[in-house]
């Protein structure tokens, strides 16, 4: 073993973080692993050297002792560093490097001791997501929708066992029903998915023809779901137990319905408020009056227009907006007024407007289309 310092061996600074130390060791372990460098004594020594350094620097107490006293401070309590009989939890280092383990151990499924394929025994089914387009009216008032979803359900022919009628699955002889096997080679001791049963813990000699041994078949089911008043785009509604059936008799997952509110031709939604534009005549803007305004529930609301109303003026109709989801009360409806200017006037209307202008002291009536003059 060389006399190089542990930080130098891993190629990191003395102030390196735990993640930096782990990453540096991972690269060296992959590069110099004996199974990838068979017969290369130098690579084997570098692998041992890197592992010894990592064993010390990964442990806060050992690292502190090393920083204060060097290797002597570590060896005094550890009995002399890393040897062939020492064991390191490589799954902690390589968590997502199942493909590398497959190369070292000749296949058999990815993952370290925390990974692996599907375990034996009952498992919860997968959750499902369904995107539902909802009209603004339904979002405001609430409505029951009927949706159709594809999902995996327990096979009715084999009742989920995966075996044909008259037969049953048997315990996998390779993993004894655990779904995983432990393999040791060189310095590694790794748990991987059992290649024979693919992690199920059982083997099926005569698979069910309907589900081909999976125990699940795809079905289309109609689900009734109540859309509550007040939902908005992105609201997620949970329907418990309406996801996919669980393998090996496990519980079903859940269904999540995500609402998307469609654009409305009249109303604009802002939170729980509604915005609507309403046009009025010039005479009503000047003299005032009363107009009918549509509401989201299909009814009409009488709105009084005061004298001198300007274009762009906003009137609030309190409590005529969208209900608050899961709470009490509603938002408001805001009416934006647009004053329409007549483009054509009758002779009588023109005379009245000219008289109005004279009373106001305005000079009007140049007539005709506008002209541009350039000097």
Curated annotation (Swiss-Prot):
Record-linked PROSITE patterns: DNAJ_1 (PS00636), DNAJ_2 (PS50076), ZF_CR (PS51188)
Pfam families reported for this sequence: DnaJ (PF00226), DnaJ_C (PF01556), DnaJ_CXXCXGXG (PF00684)
Cofactor section: Zn(2+)
InterPro entries (alphabetical): DnaJ (IPR012724), DnaJ_C (IPR002939), DnaJ_domain (IPR001623), DnaJ_domain_CS (IPR018253), HSP40/DnaJ_pept-bd (IPR008971), HSP_DnaJ_Cys-rich_dom (IPR001305), HSP_DnaJ_Cys-rich_dom_sf (IPR036410), J_dom_sf (IPR036869)
Stretches assigned to the J domain: 5-70
Subcellular location: Cytoplasm
A GO cellular component annotation in the UniProt record: cytoplasm
UniProt-annotated binding residues for Zn(2+) 2: 172, 175, 194, 197
Zinc fingers classed as CR-type: ranges: 142-220
TM helices/strands, residue ranges: none
Key words, A-Z: Chaperone, Cytoplasm, DNA replication, Metal-binding, Repeat, Stress response, Zinc, Zinc-finger
Its job: Participates actively in the response to hyperosmotic and heat shock by preventing the aggregation of stress-denatured proteins and by disaggregating proteins, also in an autonomous, DnaK-independent fashion. Unfolded proteins bind initially to DnaJ; upon interaction with the DnaJ-bound protein, DnaK hydrolyzes its bound ATP, resulting in the formation of a stable complex. GrpE releases ADP from DnaK; ATP binding to DnaK triggers the release of the substrate protein, thus completing the reaction cycle.
PANTHER family assigned: CHAPERONE PROTEIN DNAJ (PTHR43096:SF48), DNAJ HOMOLOG 1, MITOCHONDRIAL-RELATED (PTHR43096)
Free-text domain note: The J domain is necessary and sufficient to stimulate DnaK ATPase activity. Zinc center 1 plays an important role in the autonomous, DnaK-independent chaperone activity of DnaJ. Zinc center 2 is essential for interaction with DnaK and for DnaJ activity.
Self-association and partners: Homodimer.
Similarity field: Belongs to the DnaJ family.
Name of the featured protein: Chaperone protein DnaJ
Protein source organism: Leptospira biflexa serovar Patoc (strain Patoc 1 / ATCC 23582 / Paris)
Lineage: Bacteria, Pseudomonadati, Spirochaetota, Spirochaetia, Leptospirales
